[in-house]
Amino acid sequence: DKRTMAPSSLLFYLGVNKRVGGLLHHNLFFDESFDQHAIDIYEQPRWPEKPLFYVCCPSKTDPSVAPEGSENIFILIPLAPDLQGDDEPTREKYYQMVMERLEAFTGTSVRDAVVYKRSYAHREFQQDYHAYKGNAYGLANTLLQTAFLKPKMKNRKVKGLYFSGQLTTPGPGVPPSLISGEVVAGEVSKMLGLPKN
């Protein structure tokens, strides 16, 4: 609990059996208070009353990701990590809330055309990725958790224990995570006296 975690997320993956006008590939729904949503994530962690959210509709730019005449829609609601109450009724409440706003924005009924729906949040981040407190992004990018203040690759207390990935040096993202793994592999090889590949 000494570190500040980045947000978690409530995600909805939707298959819709019709085209939805009014959406682009990337859509930000910042139609409610940004400040209040930030308070609900960082200062007073709780489920937001009026969440901001992101909608990705990749079928707008790549029709091959959905059957002809259909859409593939992804919805992301940023949330505080470690929230209690991540259950199906809560998820359904947020689904209805964002879909109401999405339908109002597009002027199109979408819910009746959903043929596939899956939600993903704290529980799955913990179960599938062992994500601390169910967070989605690891450590928050704060001044005291960047550059040389990031967690080190080599454990100071346990000999031979190394870490790699986005939470260590050099940082988040796929390329830095791969570089991190290469560096750790080199350190372990050196420790074991193995030749470099």
Segments from the language model and where they lie:
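A conserved FAD-binding loop/helix module that cradles the flavin
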Residues: Q166-S189
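Mid-domain catalytic core of redox enzymes
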Residues: D1-A66
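Short glycine/proline-enriched loop/turn "hinge" motifs that connect secondary-structure elements
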Residues: P63-S70, K152-R156
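Flavin-binding catalytic cores
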Residues: R19-V20, R46-P48, E88-Q127
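Active-site-proximal substrate-binding core of FAD-dependent oxidoreductases
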Residues: K190-N197
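A glycine-rich dinucleotide-binding beta-alpha-beta segment and adjacent secondary-structure elements
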Residues: Y54, T108-P170
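Amphipathic alpha-helix from the class-I
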Residues: P78-G85
